[in-house]
Amino acid sequence: MTTWLLLVAAIVSEVTATLSLKAALDRPGLYALVVVGYLASFTLLAAVLRRGMGLGVAYGVWAALGVAATAVLSALVYDEPLTLLMTVGLVLIIGGVLLVEGGSQAAGTRPDPLPHPGAHDGAA
């Protein structure tokens, strides 16, 4: 699985857990899904970092797209308000994420391959 697909999976897990948190208020059995969703999200985010994606990019994309997806889906699922001003804010968040990612690519930062287990830097 590519690093970006792992990040998308982390975002989907986090959004699922967050939406389930509201549903669990009325159906406590859903708290298990909340816990599993957050554990999966952080595990996948750690895998993304392990593959070499920069923390600023990975966390920025994860948090921003999680906020945007949660806002849109909570409007659809829970009939929560999504005003024009909120929508403009979400567009700005997504634009900011694109700028951060573009800046990362311009700086030449790419995910590094994992070091071979047992490899060392030669220091004694």
Predicted regions and their residues:
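Polytopic alpha-helical membrane proteins, predominantly small-molecule transporters/carriers
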Residues: 1-124
